[in-house]
Amino acid sequence: MAGYKPVAIQTYPILGEKITQDTLYWNNYKTPVQIKEFGAVSKVDFSPQPPYNYAVTASSRIHIYGRYSQESIKTFSRFKDTAYCATFRQDGRLIVAGSEDGGVQLFDISGRAPLRQFEGHTKAVHTVDFTADKYHVVSGADDYTVKLWDIPNSKEVLTFKEHSDYVRCGCASKLNPDLFITGSYDHTVKMFDARTSESVLSVEHGQPVESVLLFPSGGLLVSAGGRYVKVCDMLKGGQLLVSLKNHHKTVTCLCLSSSGQRLLSGSLDRKVKVYSTTSYKVVHSFDYAASILSLALAHEDETIVVGMTNGILSVKHRKSEAKKESLPRRRRPAYRTFIKGKNYMKQRDDILINRPAKKHLELYDRDLKHFRISKALDRVLDPTCTIKTPEITVSIIKELNRRGVLANALAGRDEKEISHVLNFLIRNLSQPRFAPVLINAAEIIIDIYLPVIGQSPVVDKKFLLLQGLVEKEIDYQRELLETLGMMDMLFATMRRKEGTSVLENTSDGFPENKKIES
């Protein structure tokens, strides 16, 4: 007697997102560590120098965290009101921050009391940065002004009053100590030169500007405001290169990867988008639990830190390369185990019998082997199977139909069991890969349970859903056939015109309108 042959489960190609190098790179982070702050995290900034600590601005405090620590190693709390935009100097030794009362404070990273206090703004200071020479600080405030401060003398050097609304973001050039950028709620981004008394360039963004970023080379400017991220060429007078609209809500922060090849943007829609700086297409996306206010990347992209409106600081560390642990050496079998039976000499009358390989059957195969057809169908109609592996359910239905026992397996079911069958049909009947098998199953179910329709509201509702699905599919197929008919007519007309033009233009190899002299 031949052995039982398991049901062949038809496999289908898995359609999903293409796995790229960016996907592998940006997914190579550990589970995020979440730190609760006292208020919304308005700014995160990494020190440019080892050990790459980062400053977190939240409420009226500035916390300094170690690269891998979950506890703050230093706190600056000498603020009367909310603190903003704590930023490291290029050497990582000083940190500057603005505040709600209009003051700008300079701190030594090794101390606690402010080294300098710059007073001059009349409203909240939301952006501060060090210039490239390390001896000046630029600040922008809600009083519409931009000021340049001298650190050694604690004095104001210049004041620019060209913005007509709140100045909420800015950055200084990393190459030129006299150039810096500011963005305002008046929809403009301006470039100022400390050697002049007015701006040297103004770019219209079209929305209140929330964040600006200058590429290390100084040639490209990125501005974020509203749902737009715009990239401008500063060497061509601020010419717009590309406008990106990949977020659903206001973009609040921008960041560059360590290599400068990827641009990151965070938004109130709780997403961080990663763009290629060559094609400006989204190559990856991160999802977070709350709206995002700030974003920063560590050296070599080893850590990504995101600050949110609910006061949560999300910290992701890159996975380290797995090291092979030196496990104790397994004891090998004895030598006699390998030579057992090797010295046996074959005889002419010996009969060689191969030990049959034991086949492990699935539970539904065991039921089919013992002709428990209803039980086999029940197993594959379990919600876990129908949702994760619907192809198994379809294969079993196809096998039962081949055996001619599908009607017997579907008959005699109660309200709950028939609901499972109808749910599966409703979910998968419109899929082209399953339709040939499931249409036949649907016809059998209708024939069996037609006499009892109207006795169960639950089953009646499922049948109505199935009817609506079939009608919608029929309308869809009719529209497709109409479209195919129109396309065939167009193609036929084009072929007829091409054939006619060839006949008109050629007659025995010569143009028709040309007379041939005899």
UniProtKB/Swiss-Prot annotation:
UniProtKB keywords: Acetylation, Isopeptide bond, Nucleus, Repeat, rRNA processing, Ubl conjugation, WD repeat
Pfam families given in the database record: UTP15_C, WD40
In-chain residues carrying the UniProt-annotated modification N-acetylalanine: 2
Gene Ontology biological process terms from the UniProt entry: positive regulation of transcription by RNA polymerase I; ribosomal small subunit biogenesis; rRNA processing
Keyword Ubl conjugation: yes
Record-listed cross-link Glycyl lysine isopeptide (Lys-Gly) (interchain with G-Cter in SUMO2), residues: 249
InterPro entries to which the protein is assigned, alphabetical: U3_snoRNA-assocProt_15_C, WD40/YVTN_repeat-like_dom_sf, WD40_repeat_CS, WD40_repeat_dom_sf, WD40_rpt
Subcellular location: Nucleus, Nucleolus
This protein's name: U3 small nucleolar RNA-associated protein 15 homolog
Biological source species: Pongo abelii (Sumatran orangutan)
